[in-house]
């Protein structure tokens, strides 16, 4: 329990009283509680899919959540995060930019690589934003957020012909053993790709139950045999009793 409380404090939830019931938490609070549960679980060789962990966070707390996500990665796991916060982009070992715009003009892989090179991609709205804000941050701050170097992938998950909502026949490679951030403008199809196609696809390959009710289609998935399990962390309530509290 002491270790769990340490994680809760680390993600800015030190103000929660232990008698507070889970169903009374906000979406952002519930998601961060779920993250602390995962961080203290000692799971390894697991793919963690996290949808916008910075949602509802004060800027001062974003770095704390980034630290927890990096701890999960450093324990021997793969983390795929849907995010747009600059601090997450800086911390990423690998970035996937979905776009180039929203709706019918989205759902395509615009860029795959490290954060630094994304700023030079003219087609990417995220890249243009990064280029415009580059002067606000020093190189040392960037390095501190990510670490001394980008981690190299120990393998790849290859998802082909993903289709759901705005995502049409999109083929993407996800690096294993690193922190991979999936970014792009709102409505580009980030969550559709990750939550509604990638996560269910891996669940199917691993013969693991899937918590997503409506799933997309895909042509194939390679590399799932390199991971042991997959976990989705979003804003849905944790499974368990309505009387569960943040410490349990």
Each model region followed by its residue ranges:
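Conserved phosphate-binding elements of NTP-dependent enzyme cores
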Residues: 1-248
